[in-house]
């Protein structure tokens, strides 16, 4: 819009602007006591003897840092709740809206659910940026939600120093078929459904304004089809790869499941332009923080720094990392019994 560059109005960009994972875990430490006394997550609720509705039961809370919270509201129905928002990741307002909404919807797909309703979350510097630009952002979010068959039912807005946009999304799922981070079992292959590298390219875009259509294609592609295929394949362990990078999300899944995740670095798909950008040094601070967080728990073998930084690249609206094989998507490693490190690079 008239040469306006949205990325210049925020210090971070996309999921790279998340609070660093180590700091986030310290922040949340001790705030999960309520979940500690909850019944076994995958046990069925006690039957009602009075005919009254069954009381909701928390199935997935904050204990493992899963993609969304899940509560059982009936014998065969669970409700998924998530929220996600961030600063501009691209300069075009409409495209930013599409990416932010696609990213928010992904948390429901990552749990094996179906989005049923979304509400907008908007922070806007109205004295700096015209509201007509905010309208374009919201229109982009609406277009992404429509593509997902998910109505946008309102939202909340505040004035702020930097623009922020995203969505709170509600979804539904079969409680017996949830996909969670703590169910990876040794002997299963590891699948990744989107290539890495959008964080590197977003960093370069913010610096130069150069547009990378391949990165936009990745970030605006819904994880719906991959989620549906994962459920059909009986997969029960997985997560989406976003701000903590492939290494960070693999570490969290391995830690929650008590296993080692082995990644064959040569088999990990990476956008070719991102390889060139990484070699030129266009790595975000968020990606470096991701690597520093995972490094004490990982065996990187002979992998060089450029490779490990790409694997730690902070993704925005990335693909699904699944413990299981999904036709049409690359197998990038396997789940092993715990071998002293949560992540093993080969």
Which role fits each region the language model picked out?
Residues 93-119, 136-147, 222-234, 246-252:
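Small-aliphatic-rich amphipathic alpha-helix that forms the alpha element of a beta-alpha
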Residues 58-60, 68-71, 107-109, 142, ...:
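A generic local secondary-structure boundary/capping motif
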Residues 200-224, 228:
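Active-site/ligand-binding-proximal alpha/beta "capping" segment
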Residues 94, 211-220, 236-237, 307-311:
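Short pre-catalytic strand/loop immediately N-terminal to key active-site residues, enriched for Gly-Thr
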Residues 2-12, 18, 23-27, 36-56, ...:
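Glycine-/charge-enriched secondary-structure boundary and capping motifs
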Residues 19-20, 33-37, 59-81, 109-116:
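N-terminal glycine-rich anion-binding loops that anchor highly charged ligand groups
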Residues 74-90, 95-98, 114-207, 211, ...:
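Glycine-rich anion-binding loops of enzyme active sites
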Residues 69-80, 220-226, 291-301:
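Acidic-glycine-rich active-site phosphate/pyrophosphate-binding loop
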